[in-house]
Amino acid sequence: MEAQSFGTLNYIALFAYLGAIMAVGVYFARRQKSADDYFKAGGRIPGWAAGFSVFATTLSSITFMSIPAKAYTSDWTFLIGQYVAIAILPIVFWFYIPFFRKLNLTSVYEYLERRFDVRMRLFGSISFMLFHIGRIAIVTYLTALALMPFIDISPLMIVFLIGVLCIIYTFLGGIEGVIWTDVIQGVMLSVAAILIFVVICFNVDGGIVEVFSMSNQADKYFPAEQFSWSWTDSTIPVLMIGFFFASLQQFTASQDVVQRYIVTDNIDETKKALITNAKLVACVPIFFFAVGSALFAYYTQNPELLPENFNTGGILPFYVISQMPVGVAGLIIAAIFAASQSSISSSLNSIAACFTSDIYEKVSKNPTSEQKLRIGRTLTVVAGLLGVVASTYLIMSNESEIWDAFNSLLGLMGGPMTGLFMLGIFVRRANANSALLGVVASIATVLWVRSATDLNFFFYGVIGTLMVVIVGYLTAPMFKNNLNSDEIDELSATKEKRSTTAEKA
């Protein structure tokens, strides 16, 4: 199908948003005087803003478009995963956050060196950086491809607008600029979802009652067969287990989210961040699924409005461009840009934090704060350009399958990283060598399962995590622990309540 005419007012709305985001980066640039400012915001971020940032960071543009498409073509079962993510937050708060705050970390992978050794720290940090460079490329690439059929902006220009502007405002504003732009972007995403749903309901004969009635009649909420157990399909029990471990990885072992725990002034503000994120996750995704149901009702009543052989994966941007009022459509497309930029900017700053803390400080002798700030900004540019170049290559060569395979392989590192933190915090007798054996066993097992079985991919993270913990526990007596009992107490869950109480005081 031919691209829709985007229109002058839509362009004005889109570029007004992009200009506002740039202004935020410029504003916060003057506060970036040290590495602590650039990576931790000097502890100046209020808890509610950090929570908004976590929400925006974990919601990419692909999610923003794919959830309505999923509800349109299938059902609401994936909504279960959002509430599983909320369920793990008490675990994160009581057993993980006090360690990250008490140890005054810049990179979360510093914990792995203190608990085990430098090998585990480098494994975690390098895996994270490689994965997120790939993630930048994939998010930018898929956003460009998704929008290309519907607006008269070339995919290369979309990549440029998303990637280069992210580099600039992240370079200037550091984590503080990233978080406050995340707040803007999170608000835009939420308002956009609600606005689209309301507009569609007004255009459906019978309104909101008919929207939900039609979905109910078509059994598009939680079909009975989705409650059965399956080793190969993404049924509700599988989703609950898979999302539990996936969320645990994101909230305990991923620098881009964990970094939000240390930008607040105290642990009570960090608690507010988790509560704010939980409230947003509990409410906003429902509207994304509801948009899918509304689109189903609208196009069931108006099937002639869909082009022949239409790819329903792009149902949301198609409706926005073809049916939303001029100007409003531009703001909605800006929200899709916002969803991608919030993920990318967080990746850029967290990559810079990991490289500076985990690698540069290891090879440089006592670098000054100014030197670390300079390296952090340099890595922001380098990581961003690598992502943009990779995304451009994918668009020009149309070799997405190769890159997807590479990104999928790096994604297998998530389970081992989650397992390492779990092993360190909950298994006192674990040591560096048993942790290494656990990681090797985890990667080998997941690669074998992936290639030799039809097991659902949601089980990969489960297997990867548990293999590290089980092998790390069983092999620990074979090796001497290089930490004494007091050091293990300091780095394990045994003193969790005392540490939390002390920090509050």
Curated annotation (Swiss-Prot):
Binding-site list for Na(+) 2: D182, S342, S345, S346
Lineage of the species this protein comes from: Bacteria, Pseudomonadati, Pseudomonadota, Gammaproteobacteria, Vibrionales
Entry-linked PROSITE patterns: NA_SOLUT_SYMP_3
Protein name as annotated: Sodium/sialic acid symporter NanT
Keyword Transmembrane helix: yes
Entry's localization field: Cell inner membrane
Function noted in UniProt: Symporter that uses the Na(+) gradient as the driving force for the uptake of the sialic acid N-acetylneuraminic acid (Neu5Ac). Might play a role in persistence after colonization.
A Gene Ontology cellular-component term: plasma membrane
Knockout consequences: Deletion mutant cannot grow in minimal medium. Mutant fails to persist in the squid.
Organism: Aliivibrio fischeri (strain ATCC 700601 / ES114) (Vibrio fischeri)
